[in-house]
Structures are given as C-alpha cells and as structure tokens.
Amino acid sequence: MTKVNSQKYSKALLEVAQEKGQLEAILTEVSEMIQLFKENNLGAFLANEVYSFSAKSELIDTLLQTSSEVMSNFLNTIRSNGRLADLGEILEETKNAADDMFKIADVEVVSSIALSEAQIEKFKAMAKAKFDLNEVTVINTVNEKIIGGFIVNSRGKIIDASLKTQLAKIAAEIL
C-alpha cells in the first residue's frame, strides 16, 4: 500500500473519532493494536497470502469483540475494502498523524555515556524548543564511537554535536 492510501485511511479514522468526540479513546485503541501487532507478528500474518481470507477475517472478528463502535466500523471497512494486509501500516500512520497533530515525538539522543535524569530533562526542553513539540520522550542510546558530545534525532531531523563529527570536519578542512 502506498503511503498516500494509508494516510487516507488514517485521516478518515481520526476525522470520525474527532467528530464523535472519541479521539483520545481511539488513539488509545490504535496504540494497543500496534502493540498487539508487534508482540504477535500480526502484520506478517495478515500480509501472508498463504493464510485464507477467512482465517484473517477471524482475527478481525476477535479484535472487534473488544473494539469501540468507531474502531469496529473502521476495521470492517478495512476488511471489506481488502486492505487487511495493510492494517499494521495504517495503524502506524494513524499514530504518526496523531503525533503530528498533537506535536508529540520520540527523540533519540545518542551519547558516549548514559545520560543522567537531569540531562534527559535538558534534552527534553531543548527538543521541545528546537523541534516545536509539546510532548517529548527521550530515548538515550549509548555509542562510544562518537567519542563525546551528542547526536539528537527526531523524525529525520538531526542535530549532530558529536566530537567525532567535529573532528571529521576539522580533518576535512585541513586536507
């Protein structure tokens, strides 16, 4: 499925949820389904042509048992339009669209040593200002190869203040 098509489905779900005043509840359901898909590899199951439509449809019926009316209608639309193989991608796109709407993002901070809680709070504040976000979750990744400094990555926007990069720039200027 193209990104444009998954965006259309996710936009439709978000619009209906907003109209019905159930946006927060739907986003919770979407997050739970994404987690369920990851833990049980359901995306691969739905995309695999070896399994019959009826087997895949049984999975959707199981999901419908605990879904809200809005989510049930959405899942039935996906099923009737033959998009079960794309459901995982559509759910991810829905989460991304909602994160954009509410200016929420995960921010990866790569550093040569683990960050303290105080440093994490400073990176949250910096990321909110630099990337115009309302809510930030900092994910600290330790990579000793950057020598010192840090690299901040949020949705493809990168701030590279690592010592390794600075040394490489100096070396390029000298040569």
From Swiss-Prot:
GO terms for cellular component: plasma membrane; proton-transporting ATP synthase complex. It is a peripheral membrane protein. The keyword Disulfide bond does not apply. It is found in: Cell membrane. It comes from the Bacteria. Belongs to the ATPase delta chain family. PANTHER family: ATP SYNTHASE DELTA CHAIN. F-type ATPases have 2 components, F(1) - the catalytic core - and F(0) - the membrane proton channel. F(1) has five subunits: alpha(3), beta(3), gamma(1), delta(1), epsilon(1). F(0) has three main subunits: a(1), b(2) and c(10-14). The alpha and beta chains form an alternating ring which encloses part of the gamma chain. F(1) is attached to F(0) by a central stalk formed by the gamma and epsilon chains, while a peripheral stalk is formed by the delta and b chains. This is ATP synthase subunit delta. It comes from Lactococcus lactis subsp. cremoris (strain SK11).
